[in-house]
Amino acid sequence: MYYKAVAESMPADYPIYLYGIPQCAVNDISPALAARVAEACPNVIGLKYSFNDMIRLQKFMEIREGTFSVFSGCDDMFAMTALAGADGIVSGNAQAIPEHYVAVWEAVKAGDAKKSNADSASD
């Protein structure tokens, strides 16, 4: 398995994230594949998922009994993915307007879904 060869070429404690961006890649990473990789490679600790599919995102979050780290790559779905339990977002836009993303994240962590969605809609 390619992923195992890459993971084993790194130090055992070196954390590796998969990157799922099916609309741009020929090699889609399904939740089943991510689960197999996570099982075979202890240092593969999570995934950045850059597609607006909440069902898949939630399936990724179930890997390793919920300990597999999942980050969104979709700016327009940040509040929704954070509310669903994603670990955060990897966002180019956040480099330019970090206050917006911090406000959404803080609202989610405070349990204020209404405010997080309002902040998210203010793009």
Set out the residue ranges of the language-model regions.
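Glycine-rich anion/phosphate-binding loops
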Residues: M1
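Catalytic alpha/beta core domains of metabolic enzymes, predominantly
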Residues: A7-Y14, I21-D123
